[in-house]
């Protein structure tokens, strides 16, 4: 690997470590304690579900490992080179890191109670005057981090990126790839999984529907933003190649054109 490329990759890796560090710090911070009005109490009286359909650890594994697995499969079946794998890994990791920071920042500022907040606050169901919680302090703090849904945003940041990467590799929207329904269906599978993960949070009474919808938009936004930082538009003919590959090819062509005695075939 070229020394300049290696140094650039090291810098990108350090940036992601810093971003993930900021995300982990934000996980430990306390959210704004929003006042709950009597007329909105019904929104937060849903039962507290101990066993989630998709636990947080499983969500992180799916969101992080799915893009990496698809990138590895692309190298195996589509003969993608090391540059493509590196660029895809950088794009996916940036999407997830930025998504985590922005999602947690909004959570901490808004401080919206979860649908099961009152049962976190009062496990015995007996509400005290002034809403002085008697439940586990950690559960109560987490109960004020409803908006937006982290499960939803991370699922769409990771699986949304995977869908874009697949669409590019299969050239679903480029002139040479349109008209093949199996390509489109294959690229939509990750999005279907992301939707299932997001909706499971409403079934577990961990999020309101607005939390899930906004979380999905945040995740998709960063998935698209980071994908386009490294890959061209899906409607371009060479959408399956990262910008760095295109730049390397252009540089090689320029060197050939500048070689004495070289003639361009028309």
UniProtKB/Swiss-Prot annotation:
- Which InterPro entries does this chain map to? P_Acid_Pase_2/haloperoxi_sf (IPR036938), P_Acid_Pase_2/haloperoxidase (IPR000326), PA_PP_rel (IPR043216)
- Sorted alphabetically, which SMART domains does this protein's record hold? acidPPc (SM00014)
Q: In which pathway does it act?
A: Lipid metabolism; phospholipid metabolism
* BP GO terms, sorted: phospholipid dephosphorylation; phospholipid metabolic process
The segments labelled Phosphatase sequence motif II in the record are 148-151
EC numbers:
3.1.3.4, 3.6.1.75
Provide the activity regulation entry from the record. Answer: Magnesium-independent phospholipid phosphatase. Inhibited by N-ethylmaleimide.
Provide the active-site residues from the annotation.
151 (proton donors), 207 (nucleophile)
Indicate the annotated site residue(s) for Stabilizes the active site histidine for nucleophilic attack: 211
Q: How does it sit in the membrane?
A: Multi-pass membrane protein
From the UniProt record, list the reaction(s) this protein catalyses: a 1,2-diacyl-sn-glycerol 3-diphosphate + H2O = a 1,2-diacyl-sn-glycero-3-phosphate + phosphate + H(+); a 1,2-diacyl-sn-glycero-3-phosphate + H2O = a 1,2-diacyl-sn-glycerol + phosphate; 1,2-dioctanoyl-sn-glycero-3-diphosphate + H2O = 1,2-dioctanoyl-sn-glycero-3-phosphate + phosphate + H(+); 1,2-dioctanoyl-sn-glycero-3-phosphate + H2O = 1,2-dioctanoyl-sn-glycerol + phosphate
PANTHER family from the entry? LIPID PHOSPHATE PHOSPHATASE (PTHR10165), PHOSPHOLIPID PHOSPHATASE 5 (PTHR10165:SF87)
Name of the protein this chain belongs to: Phospholipid phosphatase 5
């Amino acid at each position: 690997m070229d020394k300049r490329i290696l140094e650039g990759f090291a810098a990108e890796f350090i940036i992601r470590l810093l971003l993930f560090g900021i995300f982990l710090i934000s996980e430990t911070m306390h959210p704004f304690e929003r006042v709950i009005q009597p007329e909105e109490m019904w929104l937060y009286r849903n039962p507290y579900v101990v066993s989630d359909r998709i636990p947080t650890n499983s969500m992180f594994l799916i969101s992080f490992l799915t893009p990496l697995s698809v990138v590895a499969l692309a190298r195996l079946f589509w003969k993608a080179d090391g540059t493509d794998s590196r660029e895809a890994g950088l794009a996916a990791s940036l999407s997830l890191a930025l998504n985590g920071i922005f999602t947690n920042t909004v959570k901490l500022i808004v401080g919206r109670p979860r649908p099961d907040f009152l049962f976190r606050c009062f496990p015995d169901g007996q509400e005290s005057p002034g809403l002085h919680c008697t439940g586990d302090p950690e559960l109560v703090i987490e109960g004020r981090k409803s908006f937006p849904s982290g499960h939803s945003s991370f699922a769409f940041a990771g699986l949304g990126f995977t869908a874009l990467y697949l669409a590019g590799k299969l050239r679903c929207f480029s002139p040479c790839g349109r008209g093949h329904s199996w390509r489109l269906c294959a690229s939509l599978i990750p999005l279907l999984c992301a939707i299932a993960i997001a909706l499971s949070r409403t079934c577990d009474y961990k999020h309101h529907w607005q939390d899930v919808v906004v979380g999905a938009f945040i995740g998709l936004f960063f998935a698209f933003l980071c994908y386009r930082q490294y890959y061209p538009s899906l409607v371009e003919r060479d959408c399956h190649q990262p910008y760095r590959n295109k730049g390397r090819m252009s540089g090689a062509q320029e060197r050939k054109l500048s070689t004495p005695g070289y003639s361009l075939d028309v």
